[in-house]
Amino acid sequence: MCDPTRDDGSSRSRVVSTMQKRAYFQRQWPLVDVVRASVVVIVHFLCLLAPFNFKWEALRFGLVLFALTTLSITFSFHRNLSHRSFKIPKWLEYPWAYSAVFALQGDPMDWVSIHRFHHQFTDSDRDPHSPKEGLLFSHILWIFDTQYIKYKCGGRDNVLDLKKQWFYKFLRRTIAVHILMFWTILYLYGGLPYLTCGGGVGIFIGYHVTWLVNSACHIWGSRSWNTKDTSRNVWWLSLFTMGESWHNNHHAFESSARQGLEWWQIDITWYLIRLFEVLGIATDVKLPSELQKQKMALVR
């Protein structure tokens, strides 16, 4: 088999051939894919049970869970760890990364590796969640085919910076323990209402909000920048995604800590980063220069 990390023509043709012939549900499913699919199915099942176990208190908890875990994903996994768009002390970096684990989107190494591959191979045959393979694939199905991702992108050698840190190695080994403990405590505290209206609804919203950035934000919306991909700005998702849906902005200036580049573009994650910068906690906060903006601007 050819090395999937190479960019020569033979590698690319093999990937395209595999895409055309791949039978999604008839393939062999390794344990990691079965676990991932099971978790997603359970979350959706709990969400369906929510109306039968409804409590306002539990629903409020679910909305808070969604907001905190989604903000943790965008602040920590995405802008801090994936793109290094700002620096914060480890005493702040690690708690935010730990909080993001409870969004049930994987450990930091896994999430960051996938996202870095997405930017390296955006919209190509080797993009982990390429829109070229369909809306459903880019939205959710890619999550359950780790062997396909490995074949397209190669190993996780793009997160060596995280592999060197004990905390992220520890989280990778023990993530299941932390998640099971959290859901056990949730049930012991609030019973089925907190499992369904709380955890189920909260994680369900967080899932689809995140996945819409991968799918919808490469199909619908407006473009402000001349990027060599299909990224779009989707304004109506900006509040729910904590600013991540200004996706054309993001692909134009990947290392920018701010994605809502206009004053009217809601970007809650940026507001948090800016707060830490004002307090002197966040440093080396990266923003696009006016010259960079001029070079990337679409000719109107």
UniProtKB/Swiss-Prot annotation:
One of its GO terms (cellular component) is endoplasmic reticulum membrane. Pathway: Lipid metabolism; polyunsaturated fatty acid biosynthesis. It comes from Arabidopsis thaliana. A motif (Histidine box-3) lies at residues 247-251. Its EC number is 1.14.19.-. It is found in: Endoplasmic reticulum membrane. The histidine box domains may contain the active site and/or be involved in metal ion binding. CDD domains: Delta9-FADS-like. This is Delta-9 desaturase-like 4 protein.
